[in-house]
């Protein structure tokens, strides 16, 4: 029983909301945009009593706050490996003003004086190990997308009303226009905030060179011992950081275990040597010798590492594991990042904090991609080491970890079977040799044996035996139509939240309009309308709710665009009107069309995804269904601008002739215009460009697809988009070229994600045109290896972050279903009889 969750759900002030992480309580005044916020951290064992004390005080003081919704969420927040801005933030309090913030902090300091908590690095901490922290920052989400950094930036207003970054770093920060909440003298008086100086500690014996890694547990530093000039690695463990329910295994315990292992392995040539350890302000530091060489990411990115050298790495890893197993140790948390790789093929074992004695095995870490998720992961055993070794070998040979999900009983597809299928496809794509494949399978099969200990065979011993492929003899039993109907039925019965959403999206998805086809309602409507007929009233009710909320929201970036805004929303409503003939949908469409035409001249982009070309395409979709002279005239008056942009774009790289943001998308819109209005004015330019794209693909086939960046493979900015363009415009002419390109591009499937815009589904979309049946089956197999049952027992797929799934059409589960079910390009456009 989760006592914390029970306490949270039974605490019922007005206007309670929740999402998958937080429960929000609106007790006080309307939430301000920004100000001094208070964060409370907590050890797992203290969380219940701290919540009860703090919530009672905040109810009395009429102050808004949010809290981690249950113990599972708090364990994730408190994880030593949490590297997000949520680390250790159990409760967040939103005071109405500076005076109230000071008042609450002083009261909380007295209320929680008997408790200690982990440090929140972005905040000022009231005293050493105090659970109370504070910082100046945003209360309401205001974000912009920084194209240079390719990430979402949180914003606040400065004293002049300008938006500036809400800095959330690893040290406390107060904007220069904000008066500190407490002076240094007040901090000393109220909070006994005196700290040890490093000059009284052993830290002064070292010269720090760089920070190698930052995590909630603590930093890892490269340093030099001053008296001997010896290069060392210094690892830090912060006090009270951990998600153990009994506090017996915290970050410090973990690092102390590494110290013990270093001392026990003193006679081994493949580990670092213990140098020293000490405390400072409750932080524990472990010093060990630095091992020279490359880390896994460095060798994965290097093209010069030969197959022979990779096999030598694996050979030496096997020798290390066999030796440790013979001596009674389990590695427990084995991954390719646990080794330093040297030019001569030797490896050194690092990060020993989870190695344990086989007589007292404990698993506290579950590194993604290294475990058979169908087994009991609460314990550690030698079989799990075998499985992890097989996955490590794959990672070294192909350059990254396999993103395989847990098994699916309904599909009769175990996690082990998924791995075996991916291995066989890797052999077909020349990523693994048949012998490497067989050896890896032998090691993986050892993980299913009941033998307590086995000697792992060496990779280079016998190359004569090859195990058969499992591709031809495995059959799947699934009904994707049934699966998608279950999901869409659920969405139809959900309520709309205050952000205009019925399901979570990615961080970027929640930054743009909830109406969008890429990350929001329009994508859901497309799927519901396509696969769940006869629910027009429910769809209309959902649309009405979202429209009401959306009218209250601030403007979004690209809010009129095809992928991120109203144009895509219009497309989804037109398709719904086509199937239902309900005049209410026509009314919705007419309103959007009018807005798009009125605001068209203000659009800065011209491209397919974000700009004028996509907007015109959505108006063409409307025009293909509804007789509207005004819309036809508007399209004809503005199409020349698209052609001028198409004609003047200089093509210097792949992105500039790609579909979403380049010439291919513009050419497709021009081609749709020609077909809709039976006007051949642009045909010569389109034909010439199509021949050019075909030549680009031919040249790439000669050099291969293996040296490209990941985005170069996909619909949005890469070759899947170019293949799709030719499928849409000149398929018959280029059919043989298209099939050849599809087959060669698929060989890079291990470098590709899953999604419609940035993954394998974008390649699968092209097969709806070429009917490349053999390749269709292979892509579906790969996608199924990256699928799993969520908490509602729905079959979902990994999204852009392999550990998560969203329903989004562009980057989530819906776009994948669309292509698996062999639907044509979502933005296909044909001339139809008008109503």
Question: For the regions a protein language model found, what residue spans apply to each?
Answer:
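Juxta-kinase regulatory segment immediately upstream of eukaryotic protein kinase catalytic domains
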Residues: 150-210
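Activation segment signature within eukaryotic-like protein kinase domains
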Residues: 313-314
